[in-house]
Amino acid sequence: MSLREIIILPDKQLRLVSKPVEKVTPEIRQLVDDMFQTMYDAPGIGLAAIQVAQPLRVITMDLAKPDAGGETKREPRVFINPEIIAKSDELSIYEEGCLSIPEYYEEVERPARVRVRFTDLDGVLREEDAEGLYATCIQHEIDHLNGVLFIDYLSKLKRDRVLKKFTKAAKRAGE
């Protein structure tokens, strides 16, 4: 396992549409291992392969929270070629953040429940229902695979403000 660099807005790679994974290979397994290590190190609860400059339809997630004793039991999840096949009419609002847009959080409205179809690390096609934060995280990460960022759901004014801030920061870092 190794840490990978997380690409940051305004990197144009974040707008790429990721390609389907044809087969779960040792390289895909290594990518998944690296993604988990990178996600946990950041720390974050979800990561799409494109965020580590790999335009493949792969997502890692872990929504585990510390228990009463402060211990966190990991609940790693892998979604290969995920697609939302059903969503509720009911909406919910969660404050979202993104490892590729560090230290910026905003409320986003999305379907409260979704059904997702994906391939697991064993190459098995699965379907699963998700609700609450789990559903929000799945939708957020699948958006990444389609070149969509959570700031795209904000007003034009807010989105432009965020883009300007991160573009300036990138220019300063390049100087």
From Swiss-Prot:
<feature type="binding site">
    <location>
        <position position="144"/>
    </location>
    <ligand>
        <name>Fe cation</name>
    </ligand>
</feature>
<keyword id="KW-0378">Hydrolase</keyword>
<dbReference type="GO" id="GO:0043686">
    <property type="term" value="P:co-translational protein modification"/>
</dbReference>
<dbReference type="GO" id="GO:0042586">
    <property type="term" value="F:peptide deformylase activity"/>
</dbReference>
<feature type="binding site">
    <location>
        <position position="140"/>
    </location>
    <ligand>
        <name>Fe cation</name>
    </ligand>
</feature>
<dbReference type="InterPro" id="IPR036821">
    <property type="entry name" value="Peptide_deformylase_sf"/>
</dbReference>
<protein>
    <recommendedName>
        <fullName>Peptide deformylase</fullName>
        <ecNumber>3.5.1.88</ecNumber>
    </recommendedName>
</protein>
<feature type="binding site">
    <location>
        <position position="98"/>
    </location>
    <ligand>
        <name>Fe cation</name>
    </ligand>
</feature>
<keyword id="KW-0408">Iron</keyword>
<comment type="similarity">
    <text>Belongs to the polypeptide deformylase family.</text>
</comment>
<dbReference type="GO" id="GO:0046872">
    <property type="term" value="F:metal ion binding"/>
</dbReference>
<dbReference type="GO" id="GO:0006412">
    <property type="term" value="P:translation"/>
</dbReference>
<dbReference type="Pfam" id="PF01327">
    <property type="entry name" value="Pep_deformylase"/>
</dbReference>
<comment type="function">
    <text>Removes the formyl group from the N-terminal Met of newly synthesized proteins. Requires at least a dipeptide for an efficient rate of reaction. N-terminal L-methionine is a prerequisite for activity but the enzyme has broad specificity at other positions.</text>
</comment>
<keyword id="KW-0648">Protein biosynthesis</keyword>
<dbReference type="InterPro" id="IPR023635">
    <property type="entry name" value="Peptide_deformylase"/>
</dbReference>
<keyword id="KW-0479">Metal-binding</keyword>
<feature type="active site">
    <location>
        <position position="141"/>
    </location>
</feature>
